[in-house]
Regions:
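Short, acidic, metal-binding catalytic loop of nucleotide-sugar glycosyltransferases
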Residues: 20-29
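Glycine-rich, basic loop-to-helix element that forms the pyrophosphate-binding segment
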Residues: 55-72, 80-82, 93
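A recurrent flexible, glycine/aromatic-enriched loop bordering the glycosyltransferase active site
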Residues: 131, 135-140, 146-169, 188, ...
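A conserved acidic beta->alpha catalytic loop
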Residues: 21, 35-44, 57, 87
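A short, conserved alpha-helix in the catalytic core of glycosyltransferases
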Residues: 158-213
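Short aromatic/hydrophobic "clamp" motif used to bind/position activated sugar donors
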Residues: 77
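Active-site-adjacent helix/loop segment of glycosyltransferases
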Residues: 205-293
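Conserved donor NDP-sugar-binding/catalytic core segment of glycosyltransferases
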Residues: 87-127, 133-134
Length: 315
């Protein structure tokens, strides 16, 4: 069984095309929809015959995915955003690639191309080929905004974007912390990078499969930060620090210190001046410092890969 997890929150405008792509997959899948208290027609569009978990409030992306994982039957789990469209062979090609790569590969992504509009109209621009990190602790989608070039082969990447990610169930079970696969403290945004980093620490790898193609409408990017809702920016600030506090070892922290400190000072200056709506992020981090450190201790205790082995991914 292959499980497809779809988290909705006022996603009606994208759902018809997204659901059509899932229905056209060349391999049978079970679809699990978790709705975070949508006020639009999302659930009506999903319709009958689909397992739906209805939340009375918006519990956040991470918690919603964990809810779906608790009932999913698949040995493979595809996480799909409502604003994504899968080509028919997407799931089948990713599974075949992971099977060939071996158990050390816990996650895979196809080539995500940029899409636009409610109808998820296709373009030839890259949206994501995976996740990469810089020495400043920032993470980006590999090749985002570049022109698509055919003829690529499968290759290893640091991690995969949660927009259209395939995970082995065995990988998700192995990296869970206190029963949570996706850390619910993240609520939304950067949780896929957190899972990717944790997976690396626990000895797993990730695969980019260019022959598996999907399309994704990218709505949250650094370029549009100033027009995003304040709550989005608040979670983004909170999670950029939470990501490192949990996963970064002392060697990487020392190696990357000049770059991270520069970036942190810029972010803090912005929060204290032009983006004061994100101040609650800093308060949250302080208030929850003991829980954060408890998670850090558990992750660092269970890690099997050293910072020195991971350092080449941060560049």
């Amino acid at each position: 069984v292959i499980s497809v997890v779809l988290v909705t929150w006022n996603s009606a405008r994208y759902l018809p095309r997204c659901l059509a792509g899932i229905a056209l997959q060349t391999i049978a899948v079970e679809l699990i929809v978790v709705d975070n208290a949508s006020s639009d027609d999302s659930l009506e569009i999903v319709g009958d015959g689909v397992r739906v978990i209805r939340n009375a409030t918006n519990r956040g992306f991470s918690a919603a995915v964990n809810q779906a994982l608790a009932v999913a039957r698949g040995q493979y789990i595809l996480l799909c955003n409502p604003d994504a469209y899968l080509t028919p062979t997407y799931v089948q090609r990713l599974i075949a690639a992971l099977e060939a790569a071996g158990e050390s590969y816990g996650a895979a992504t196809g080539k995500l191309l940029r899409a636009t509009g409610d109808a998820i109209e296709r373009t030839d621009l890259i949206d994501s080929k995976g996740i990469r990190f810089t020495r400043s602790g920032r993470h980006f989608d590999v090749a985002q905004g570049e022109i698509n070039v055919p003829g690529e082969t499968n290759r290893e990447v640091f991690g995969v974007s949660g927009a259209c990610a395939l995970y082995r169930r065995s990988f998700l079970n192995a990296v869970a912390i206190d029963g949570e696969v996706f850390d619910e403290d993240f609520f939304a945004y950067r949780e896929d990078a957190d899972l990717a980093w944790r997976g690396r620490l626990f000895g797993f790898r990730a695969l980019y499969v260019p022959d598996a193609v999907a399309y994704h409408v990218r709505t949250v990017t650094p370029e549009v930060r100033r027009v995003l809702a304040p709550v989005i920016n608040m979670h983004s600030v909170k999670n950029r620090f939470l990501l490192r506090l949990k996963n970064e070892g002392l060697y990487l922290a020392a190696r990357n210190a000049p770059f991270e400190l520069t970036r942190d000072l810029i972010a803090l200056a912005a929060v204290l001046t032009i983006e004061r709506s994100s101040l609650p992020a800093l308060a949250w981090l302080w208030k929850n410092r003991r829980r954060i450190m408890a998670k850090r201790r558990e992750i660092q205790r269970r890690r099997v890969v050293s910072d020195r082995e991971l350092a080449h991914w941060f560049r």
